[in-house]
From Swiss-Prot:
Major enzyme class: transferase
Phylogenetic classification of the source organism: Eukaryota, Metazoa, Chordata, Craniata, Vertebrata
Region (Interaction with TAX1BP1): 1-374
UniProt-listed GO biological process terms: antigen processing and presentation of exogenous peptide antigen via MHC class II; antiviral innate immune response; autophagosome assembly; bone resorption; canonical NF-kappaB signal transduction; CD40 signaling pathway; cytoplasmic pattern recognition receptor signaling pathway; DNA damage response
One annotated GO molecular function: protein kinase B binding
Metabolic or biological pathway, per its Swiss-Prot or TrEMBL entry: Protein modification; protein ubiquitination
Any one Gene Ontology cellular component term annotated for this protein: CD40 receptor complex
Protein name: TNF receptor-associated factor 6
Species this chain originates from: Bos taurus
Keyword Electron transport: no
InterPro entries associated with the record: MATH/TRAF_dom, TNF_rcpt-assoc_TRAF_met, TRAF-like, TRAF1-6_MATH_dom, TRAF6_MATH, TRAF6_RING-HC, TRAF6_Z2, Znf_RING
Length: 542
């Protein structure tokens, strides 16, 4: 049986009481409803407080827990104790899970047991909550009644908390000291340049900081690091330098403060090296042959410099032509840029107009539905693959109207992940109210009946659609007049249909799933009832 439910479509956690209420309603075979928040989360996930209640209280009691308060299933202290007609006590979540997984029988004596036969054992609950327990946090010696344990843990100085910088767990009483003095990711300033960095990066930074003090390896002078290259090249008196005449063949190297003495002592040898280099250069230059003909016989009749002047003149003309062409191209580029900007404005305006027209067409189409809308979800195989890969799958339908005038609604479909508690591998289906054209003329909150159907697309004469019907509950926020384009609160079924059931018939055809929504407001609810399909009541199973 599907669980009728209003859930938070943003994936936010429900409170402990909401989760328990939903489970209780499910165990009685009824549809539990609550508000839902629309968003992009992948599935409806159980809150952390509910997950803690899957089994009994796993705490150390002082004195030790009596066996009569132990759950026979989880062997822990009874949480939300319930009693069976055969007199056995169980955790509420444990026995419900046992009935659903192992069948309708008592795990102790195998007596027939239905969920609606369970009743709360408030006496045992009070007794257990009054028992003394030890704080589970290491180092804490506090004892308190079980009912106060959660409040104590929220303030216990020995509770573990993650460091916001390095993410390692520490007890709350030691966390501040760790953050300020011990955390390797704590921010510290460089003593030289005042740049802030993580403590674990400080050593590497100090090895490269441009303002850090360093000592010259030759003269032991202390300078900042960015001055050291110039010091080596120009100032250091003991840095090794080559002889000034190294280009002429002197390969001696000495300290800079010894260079002057070296030049003075080796003046003659340096002069010989220079003379030899000049002589070698002179021999490398070939002699100019003498002319044997008169000069006027070897020179053309034109002036010697006329050819050069002509070339220069041609170059000047070419440069002027290129400059003129460059100016014209610059003007053309500016004109084209201006035209492009104007056309871009026109294109953007056309896009806005097209979007407006598309919205109007969609609005007109939505108004023609008259309360019956068939949602075609294409590429459904891709959505199923994403669900198997634990990727979020949340899809919203276009808006549609219940009539003209009428309320504007939309549907939201979740594919619950395989890891989801209690609703793994289910299709969740919800309805949201939307801001519509006629909202100011309609009575609020919305009242009526909604039938949700996944259509069988087989060619059989009798098609077996999967459908559920629900009555609106005006007191819920899901049916109030929306104040934003889509009401964040939704109403529907967390476990509308199992994916395994989806594959057993031709619900998916041509990679398309068809979801039908039929809405009857309070003015035309008789149509559904004439068909003999009565909505489920939250009290029908009690």
């Amino acid at each position: 049986m599907s669980l009728l439910h209003c859930e938070n479509s943003c994936g936010s956690s429900q409170s402990e009481s909401d989760c328990c209420a939903a489970m209780a309603a499910s165990s009685c075979g009824t549809a539990a409803k609550d508000d839902s928040v629309s968003g992009t989360a992948s599935t409806v996930t159980l809150s952390s407080s509910f997950m803690e209640e899957i089994q009994g209280y796993d705490v150390e009691f002082d004195p030790p827990l009596e066996s009569k308060y132990e759950c026979p299933i989880c062997l822990m202290a009874l949480r939300e104790a319930v009693q069976t007609p055969c007199g056995h006590r169980f955790c509420k979540a444990c026995i419900i899970k046992s009935i659903r997984d192992a069948g309708h029988k008592c795990p102790v004596d195998n007596e027939i047991l239905l969920e609606n036969q369970l009743f709360p054992d408030n006496f045992a609950k009070r007794e257990i909550l009054s028992l003394m327990v030890k704080c589970p946090n290491e180092g804490c010696l506090h004892k308190m009644e079980l009912r106060h344990l959660e409040e104590h843990q929220a303030h216990c100085e020995f509770a573990l908390m993650s460091c916001p910088q390095c993410q390692r767990p520490f007890q709350k009483c030691h966390l501040n000291i760790h953050i300020l003095k011990e955390c390797p990711r704590r921010q510290v300033p460089c003593e030289n340049c005042a740049v802030s960095m993580a403590f674990e990066d400080k050593e590497i930074h100090e090895q490269n900081c441009p303002l850090a003090n360093v000592i010259c390896e030759y003269c032991n002078t202390m300078l900042i690091r960015e001055q050291m290259p110039n010091h080596y090249d120009l100032d250091c008196p003991t840095a090794p330098v080559p002889c000034t005449f190294s280009a002429f063949g002197c390969h001696e190297k000495m300290q800079r403060n010894h260079l002057a003495r070296h030049l003075q002592e080796n003046t003659q040898s340096h002069m010989r090296m220079m003379a030899q280099a000049v002589q070698t250069l002179s021999l490398a230059v070939a002699p100019v042959p003498q002319c044997t003909m008169p000069l006027y016989d070897s020179v053309p009749p034109t002036r010697p410099s006329s050819g050069r002047h002509s070339e220069v003149h041609n170059f000047q003309e070419t440069i002027q032509q290129l400059e003129g062409r460059l100016v014209r191209q610059d003007h053309q580029i500016r004109e084209l840029t201006a035209k492009m900007e104007t056309q871009s404005m026109y294109v953007n305006e056309l896009k806005r107009t097209i979007r407006t027209l598309e919205d109007k067409v969609a609005e007109i189409e939505a108004q023609q539905c008259n309360g019956i809308y068939i949602w075609k979800i294409g590429n459904f195989g891709m959505h199923l693959k994403s669900q198997e890969e634990e990727k979020p799958v949340v899809i919203h339908s276009p808006g549609f109207y219940t009539g003209k005038p009428g309320y504007k609604l939309c549907m939201r479909l979740h594919l619950q992940l395989p890891s989801a508690q209690r609703c793994a591998n289910y299709i969740s289906l919800f309805v949201h109210t939307m801001q519509g054209e006629y909202d100011s003329h309609l009575p609020w909150p919305f009242q009526g009946t909604i039938r949700l159907t996944i259509l069988d697309q087989s060619e059989a004469a009798v098609r077996q659609n999967h459908e559920e019907i629900m009555d609106a509950k005006p007191e819920l926020l899901a049916f109030q007049r929306p104040t934003i384009p889509r009401n964040p609160k939704g109403f529907g079924y967390v476990t509308f249909m199992h994916l395994e059931a989806l594959r057993q018939r031709t619900f998916i055809k041509d990679d398309t799933l068809l979801v039908r929504c039929e809405v009857s407001t309070r003015f035309d609810m008789g149509s559904l009832r004439r068909e003999g399909f009565q909505p489920r009541s939250t009290d029908s199973g009690i």
